[in-house]
Amino acid sequence: MKRVYIMVLDSFGIGSSADAERFGDVGSDTLGHIAQACAAGTADKGRSGSLHLPNLSRLGLGKAAEASTGTFPAGLDENADIIGAYAHASEISSGKDTPSGHWEIAGVPVLFDWGYFKDEENSFPQELLDKLVKRANLPGYLGNCHSSGTVILDQLAEEHMKTGKPIFYTSADSVFQIACHEETFGLDKLYELCEIAREELTEGDYNIGRVIARPFIGDKPGNFERTGNRHDLAVEPPAPTILKKLVDEKGGEVVSVGKIADIYAQVGITKKVKATGIDALFDATLKEMDSAGDNTIVFTNFVDFDSAYGHRRDIPGYAAALELFDRRLPELMSRVTGDDILILTADHGCDPSWHGTDHTRENVPVLIYGPKVKPGSYGHRETFADIGQTVAAYFGLSPMDYGKSIL
């Protein structure tokens, strides 16, 4: 029975890539800087001491990071018995965003340039805004700027609740984000607005990767919080991914846990499972692994590393989340039997010690585990697409256009 379990630790980079200068990210190192802070005792909020990741270490995380940066992460076990295949991979996609990283993992790198809203203030074209107001019958809008999602809620959420005007904002990514209160504005109404925005952006040829619904609750600054009802409206990948090929060529199953389905615009997904938070995502993944049949991919995105800790530049929070993931990892590994393959990786970096709030251009770990996987170093992978090619070869799919099989 052939089954692949892909776990994306969203934003878990292991050192700046060779082209990081193009992004202003030379020296960024998500894992390395978290480990440094823990070892120095400056990440003791809600946890304490050196970063403790014994299970990831046995899969080769520390050695992959050392190969990427030249430095072994502070506090991790240098003498761990390696039980998995490990490598570090660089991205060839033009951006450092979520769709680019995920599509490349699935064998389809983004070699075109996304469109971006580059102006910090008055970020969106007036023509686009006027169309949204007219089509969605809005009383107006707030924001129209670059911002962190949590900061803008403290600034504008009260006014939004009073006026019914949605909050429009963007970032360094190719995104149009809309924040609205779940109760005063309504979740369905927010989703409808996002559908309209997606249509206008596509028809207007803006080449924007995602429209993101950002629902929130709360009643005053300091207690506004985003809910788990986020919804991403992405464009479709420009070529068939390993997900679509498994379904089309083998009649296989692809189970999305978390936001995977949204990232691939639902293409190549046969089942969607919603879950919010690391524990809930883990529980949902284990349940799907228990029922997975032949020719199945279970694909989970652990978004909290990125959204709750990376973008918010929360080093102790990121460290605690990694330690939680590591504690639960044996539950997952014990379900990897026979011909099964488990792949742990990331889609980009988001160094919580870095300036600003955006992603960082980094290499990512590629950790592969299975009863028939030969442990050891598999070197530097020149593209995330090596993961996709590995999966294609494993299932006997037609080869992908990019990448070389790792195993």
Curated annotation (Swiss-Prot):
Residue ranges of coiled coil: none
In terms of Pfam families, this protein maps to:
Metalloenzyme
Query: Major location, coarse class?
Result: cytoplasm
Q: Fetch the CDD domains from UniProt.
A: PPM
Q: Which residues bind Mn(2+) 1?
A: D10, D347, H348
Output the Gene Ontology terms for molecular function. magnesium ion binding; manganese ion binding; phosphopentomutase activity
The entry's free-text remark on the cofactor is:
Binds 2 manganese ions.
Q: Where in the cell is it found?
A: Cytoplasm
Q: Which domain of life is it from?
A: Bacteria
The alphabetized UniProt keywords are: Cytoplasm, Isomerase, Manganese, Metal-binding
Which residues are listed for Mn(2+) 2 binding in this entry?
Answer: D306, H311, H359
The protein's required cofactor(s) are namely:
Mn(2+)
One biological-process term from Gene Ontology?
5-phosphoribose 1-diphosphate biosynthetic process
HAMAP family listed in its UniProt record = Phosphopentomut
**Protein name per Swiss-Prot or TrEMBL:** Phosphopentomutase
Q: What is the lineage of its organism?
A: Bacteria, Pseudomonadati, Pseudomonadota, Gammaproteobacteria, Enterobacterales
The gene for this chain is: deoB
